[in-house]
Amino acid sequence: MKFLEKLTSKKGQIAMELGILVMAAVAVAAIAAYFYATNVSNTGKQITNSTNQTTQALADAISDATSQMSNITD
């Protein structure tokens, strides 16, 4: 019970400490949200680049196949 008496005797200090703790938690959450948002943005760009490269590779393969077919019929 002496522990509780010590806590209640310094109410102002506890309020300040809790405020600092909440402020630190908010700062950590803001930093985590920033990195999450940047990673989501980068992932979208990487997916777009990968899709474009795949589409280009397939278009090249189709072009090669059609040119070989035209060589067969000549």
UniProtKB/Swiss-Prot annotation:
Propeptide residue interval(s): 1-12
Annotated InterPro entries: Class3_signal_pept_motif
Keyword field contains DNA damage: no
Annotated positions of the Pyrrolidone carboxylic acid modification: 13
Post-translational note: The N-terminus is cleaved by the prepilin peptidase EppA, which recognizes the class III signal sequence.
Record bears the keyword Secreted: yes
Signal peptide boundaries: none
GO CC annotation terms, alphabetical: cell surface; extracellular region; membrane
Domain-related comment: Contains an amino terminal motif QXSXEXXXL, which is part of a class III signal sequence.
Stated role: Major component of the type IV-like pili.
Protein name, entry field: Major structural pilin EpdE
Organism listed in the record: Methanococcus maripaludis (strain DSM 14266 / JCM 13030 / NBRC 101832 / S2 / LL)
Gene that produces this protein: epdE
